[in-house]
């Protein structure tokens, strides 16, 4: 028994997660009625979601309070990459529609408790109001826009106070970081529970019923992750981007795939940035911000399903109109974190461009919920891993420019 325990302790975390995936898959197929196993996954995701807002607040406030005047953070380039990457992902989804046109079988039951936003203005109005949320409420409800805003304000205010107060916030940051390490160490057990729940509740029939739609969604996301993003990285750094790309997908994308939550993956991304030796002053802001606005996967989902609806209803559109859809999808996707239901509930905004009624658009959303088990996992993996990738290549590009 001691030998098994020692072997487990020495095993790499990613290998442990792989073992957890296999065990969860087997249990989901062989013992689907033992629902208690799924609670392990809920506890894991719940723990990450619970600690993440406090971690972000403490780390960002601590970083800002200790930041020296004129210190380089590369945030401008990172934000440009976030927005450009989201737009390019939306554009790739348009091209995928021309190569593999889809149609949908509608009359799908829809969760009527969810209501889509009335337009892009409403999406951004919601985001702006989140900026001025009560700081305690922002922490309690995981409103990361509000958490970031108040952490920046507290950090700036702490610049002018005695060092004892700064030491207090640093202690809080260290304590929350240690708690995150403990939680991540039980990731294999949590992911085993998540895989079990997915398999036992949905089975594998979903793969055959909506195979082509799933293939187009996943294939487009893989193309962005393995071609478009590396191309952006190469243009900026003039170095082989794939070692970094695969590191981000392995260490960030894998956990994000199973947690299906960019917010829950923030602690994982912060740890990865530290392991990569990136500037703390940069990644403590860019990673939580990326979880809010870096939404390439969401833009792909919006465009693929919207254009599938357009094909289904026989609406003819030219490429310029599809290009306009990419802009709308990119802007909408940046607000996906502020909408209940995420990217799927922003599909009616895009459908409205083509005169598709809200009732019909919500049927398209219903199809999205059916494939959501796979779509949401891949979407989150792409979004979250790209947060680290863009942060890293922005810093590499900066130092390359300084040396030149």
From Swiss-Prot:
Chief localization: membrane
Gene Ontology BP terms: serine transport; threonine transport
InterPro entries cross-referenced by the UniProt entry: Na-dicarboxylate_symporter, Na:dicarbo_symporter_sf, Ser_Thr_transp_SstT
Disulfide bonds: none
Cellular component aspect of the GO annotation: plasma membrane
Catalytic activity: L-serine(in) + Na(+)(in) = L-serine(out) + Na(+)(out); L-threonine(in) + Na(+)(in) = L-threonine(out) + Na(+)(out)
Cited PANTHER family: PROTON/GLUTAMATE-ASPARTATE SYMPORTER (PTHR42865), SERINE_THREONINE TRANSPORTER SSTT (PTHR42865:SF8)
Name of the molecule in the record: Serine/threonine transporter SstT
């Amino acid at each position: 028994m001691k030998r098994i325990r020692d072997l487990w302790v020495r095993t790499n975390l990613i290998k442990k997660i792989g073992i957890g995936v296999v065990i969860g898959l087997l249990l989901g197929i062989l013992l689907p009625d033992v629902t208690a196993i799924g609670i392990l996954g809920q506890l894991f995701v719940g723990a990450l979601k619970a600690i993440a807002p406090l971690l972000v607040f403490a780390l960002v406030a601590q970083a800002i309070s200790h930041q020296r005047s004129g210190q380089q953070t590369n945030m401008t380039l990172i934000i440009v990459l976030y927005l450009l990457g989201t737009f390019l992902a939306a554009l790739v989804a348009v091209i995928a529609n021309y190569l593999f046109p889809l149609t949908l079988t509608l009359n799908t039951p829809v969760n009527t408790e969810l209501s889509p936003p009335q337009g892009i203005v409403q999406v951004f109005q919601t985001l702006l109001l989140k900026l001025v949320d009560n700081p305690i409420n922002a922490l309690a409800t995981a409103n990361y826009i509000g958490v970031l805003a108040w952490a920046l304000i507290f950090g700036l205010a702490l610049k002018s106070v005695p060092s004892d107060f700064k030491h207090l916030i640093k202690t809080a940051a260290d304590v929350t970081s240690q708690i995150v390490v403990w939680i991540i160490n039980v990731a294999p057990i949590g992911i085993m529970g998540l895989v079990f729940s997915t398999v036992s509740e949905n089975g594998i029939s979903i793969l055959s019923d909506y195979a082509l739609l799933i293939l187009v969604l996943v294939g487009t996301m893989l193309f962005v992750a393995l071609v478009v993003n590396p191309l952006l990285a190469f243009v900026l750094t003039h170095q082989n981007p794939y070692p970094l790309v695969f590191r981000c997908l392995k260490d960030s994308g894998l956990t994000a795939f199973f947690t299906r939550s960019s917010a829950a993956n923030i602690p994982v991304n912060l740890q990865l940035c530290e392991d990569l030796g990136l500037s703390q002053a940069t990644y403590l802001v860019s990673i939580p911000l990326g979880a809010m606005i870096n939404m390439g996967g969401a833009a792909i989902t919006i465009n693929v399903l919207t254009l599938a609806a357009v094909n289904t209803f026989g609406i003819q559109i030219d490429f310029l109109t599809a290009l306009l859809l990419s802009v709308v999808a990119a802007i909408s996707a940046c607000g996906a974190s502020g909408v209940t239901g995420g990217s799927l509930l922003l599909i009616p905004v895009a459908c409205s461009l083509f005169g598709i009624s809200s009732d019909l658009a919500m049927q398209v959303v219903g199809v999205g919920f059916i494939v959501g088990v796979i779509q949401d996992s891949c979407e989150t993996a792409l979004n979250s891993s790209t947060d680290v990738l863009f942060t890293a290549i922005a810093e590499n590009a900066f130092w390359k420019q300084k040396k030149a």
